[in-house]
Amino acid sequence: MTDLKLRFLLNSQEIFSKLAKNFICEKTKYYLRLKNNALSLSNNDKNAICNALLQSKFTFRLANLPCVILLYDFCDLAILEVLFNDADELKNFKLPSVIDNLVLENITNNDSYALNNVALFGNPRFKFNYQNALKYAQNLANFSLQSPGLISAYDGIRCVLISLIKPLKATLNKFLAHKNTKSINELNFILMQNIAIMQSFGAIFDEKILNVFLSFLNNYTTNLNELAKKNYLCEYLQVQNIGVQSFAILERERSVLEDDCIAKSHELENILKEWVFVLHDDEFFYSSPLGKNELKSTLAPLFSRKINMFLTQIYSLNYESIGIKANELFVLASLFGSLYQSQKFAKFAKKLNNISINSNQIVKYKILNKAFNGAQMDDFKKQLSQNIAQSVKKLDKKNQKLYKKVDEIKEILKIYEEKGF
């Protein structure tokens, strides 16, 4: 048996009275739910990201072909599937009038009625239950947004943002406990994820509301970045047992920055409480008019714009900015690439991550080079200069490979933008 099939949306109020008179059906029931974007028949799966739906399956034969009618307990949705052995059977098939009169729509190629979408979002003609989705999004370790076109941009973006709250709080606590370079970098990354989403797709939120949170996060992250640089330099000098005249000044600057970041961390905890309140909005009160539009087509032009901004940044040779922008685009490709059902986004994200790593390495070398400016360490500074040159050359090769992927990604986004699915 091949996967050749036709699928039809039926008038469920009449279909079973007709079937009872004309066909002999075998009925089975099972629970349908989505686990890690794969269908599961379990009713009590802890990792499931939606409520279980009771699906009734009626099997029978029509013109000697196997047929299935799927009925769900949440609404009057009924789907007829007719299965074929080969293309000739499909081409010559014609529904008998008793069923043809009950067909509302041919949904063979309509992904909104695919089983995984039905399992996650219920009736494709639904009012999306955002509060229910939040319960799953905020507790999942790895939230992947694979959704049908019918979910709004406002709901989709907030699902991703709410899933980042728990890891953000955890990394914030880790920073306050350790205050070392590793914990600073981890906190920086999770903050950057939030900022990248809010800046890139901020047009779906009320501008004034969003700016309150975005302004604080940007200021906090700027200070945290400076602290990361000072911490890295101080730790490097201590490990390498290198003494420079300005070390005492450097350590004092680092200490002042650390105290400031700790104070602002407590403010961040309060800001996050308010942000969670906004993300739980169930009435589109904090949404812009754009937020009510469909998710995929709304995000596509915003995604493309972010790519163009990154490409412009590459030519600036400001390696710190290149690293930040590559990281931001990596976040977007990782979190939202699955929306567009193409493996190219994962490969694109991998290349962006490589560019970010190389750019950050150049920045570290430059931090050391600046710190030892004027010091009598000619051999060390010569080695640093060589490391910088090698890293720049390596980064240029990474950029060239990325350009080949950019056009492919933009073509995919263009399709969604133009057709509006």
Model-identified regions with their sequence ranges:
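Phosphate-end processing signature that detects enzymes handling 5′-triphosphorylated RNA
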Residues: 1-421
